[in-house]
Amino acid sequence: QKPGEAVILEQSIDNDGLGQYTFGFKTSDGLIRQEQGVVKNQGTENEALEVRGTITWLGADGKDYSINFVADENGFQPQYTQ
């Protein structure tokens, strides 16, 4: 590992093959990503994928920062937390 490069410490992936999935990972530089997707209104004209997730990272100040998000038919909707 070179200075400034991160490696994946943990990783999980699950996909049911029908549009629903979960995945996540954690890296050596403190980045954590969790995400899940589900098909809403499946089989209708209003069918849409809804994705929810969280991205957390360690700031240069040593504090954790996070973005929780939803992405669906209404677009990408992030919420920042500290």
From Swiss-Prot:
UniProt-recorded Gene Ontology molecular function terms: structural constituent of chitin-based larval cuticle
SS bonds (residue pairs): none
Entry's transmembrane regions: none
Entry GO CC: chitin-based extracellular matrix
Pyrrolidone carboxylic acid found at: Q1
InterPro entries (alphabetical): CHIT_BIND_RR_consensus, Cuticle_Struct_Prot, Insect_cuticle
Protein keywords: Cuticle, Pyrrolidone carboxylic acid
All residue ranges annotated as the Chitin-binding type R&R domain in the record: 18-82
Role summary: Component of the abdominal endocuticle.
The name this protein goes by in its record: Endocuticle structural protein SgAbd-6
